[in-house]
Amino acid sequence: MADTGSFIHLARPLGPATVGVAPSTAPLNVVIQPQAIFSILDHSLRRNADQERVIGTLLGTRSEDGTEVEIRTCFAVGHTETTDQVEVDMEYQKQMLALHLKANPKEVLVGWYATSSELNTFSALIQNFYGGQGDGTWPHPAVHLTVSTEPGKDIETRTYISAPVGVTAERAADSAAFIPVPYEIRYSEAERNGLEAIAQARDAEDRASSLFTDIETLEKSIEEVLGMIDRVSKYVESVIDEEAPASTALGQFLLNALALAPKVDPADIESDFNKHIQDVLVVSYLANTIRTQMELSNRLATAQLTLGGGDSTAIGGTGAESGGQRGGQRNNRQRGGQQRNQAEELRA
């Protein structure tokens, strides 16, 4: 999460005033979903070798008062960029935007992204297009998201909005003042666990990672908490011994964290923890029992189908044999009748 205390919020007129429409001037906070970042990184990996950056459109939701924007999805937009000019496939952008809005009616256009931290004249030109009237985000500000994708370096993410600067009318289209705004990458507990499981396969030779059981997950969580407590204890001891500089903000954060701890006896905590362990064991036992029962049911069903097919074959064979016997008896009776007729003719 970005440090929200290092940002200043300014009033931001985004263009010429329209009758009955006023631009939003409230502070803005941006929430980014992880799937949007992954889509941007995937787009960066598929870019041409001669492209320094790629761009695309950001879609998401906006709060009723316009003070919070949530970036949920995005799609790539083709463009060519040289030292003298930039060309963006706006027709493709409009068609894809209409298609996405038709599939997700609750989402709206919120801005655009680029895989470069550099802000230049071309960035201002694209920003003014996305924040303009008609097909843009007017009267709300267009959010510009930059994601650095340099190999071997950490991924840096920044968010901006823009405001016009005092230039001539001829330079208004490619001029803008980019203002940083706070942001946060918000993800659920399930998404975090999934990402951790995927990250564990990074160093494996077969690129595979096994899922943890409930007991293993609980053990890992306890180890992480103990590790964090150990780091905090070492930091506090180093500050007390004047080996490390003190931080008022960090001290206030630790004080607030300790204030949230419930004031209960250690014996009660141990009792509750043991009960939780028992609950986890019961759930794990029931899950294994259900899994075993399902496997047994599948095996019984397979065996029943196999035995049922054999019985049908045997019954069919018995029927054929009995039919053959009946046919043979009829033939014997016919031959016996013929012999009696011949004997009577001879006597006559």
Swiss-Prot record:
Q: Name one GO biological process term.
A: formation of cytoplasmic translation initiation complex
* The MPN domain, residue ranges: 30-166
Q: From which domain of life does this come?
A: Eukaryota
One Pfam match: JAB
The record ties this protein, via Gene3D superfamilies, to: Cytidine Deaminase, domain 2 (3.40.140.10)
> Region (Disordered) spans which residues?
312-348
GO molecular function of the protein, one example? translation initiation factor binding
Database matches in InterPro entries: eIF3f, EIF3F/CSN6-like_C, JAMM/MPN+_dom, MPN
Q: Where in the cell is it found?
A: Cytoplasm
Q: What are the Low complexity biased-composition ranges?
A: 328-341
* Gene Ontology, cellular component aspect: eukaryotic 43S preinitiation complex; eukaryotic 48S preinitiation complex; eukaryotic translation initiation factor 3 complex, eIF3m
Q: Where is the composition biased (Gly residues)?
A: 312-327
Q: Keywords of this protein's UniProt record, alphabetized?
A: Cytoplasm, Initiation factor, Protein biosynthesis
Its subunit composition reads:
Component of the eukaryotic translation initiation factor 3 (eIF-3) complex.
Q: Which HAMAP family match?
A: eIF3f
Family recorded in the similarity comment: Belongs to the eIF-3 subunit F family.
Q: What does this protein do?
A: Component of the eukaryotic translation initiation factor 3 (eIF-3) complex, which is involved in protein synthesis of a specialized repertoire of mRNAs and, together with other initiation factors, stimulates binding of mRNA and methionyl-tRNAi to the 40S ribosome. The eIF-3 complex specifically targets and initiates translation of a subset of mRNAs involved in cell proliferation.
Q: What is this protein called?
A: Eukaryotic translation initiation factor 3 subunit F
Species name for this entry?
Coccidioides immitis (strain RS) (Valley fever fungus)
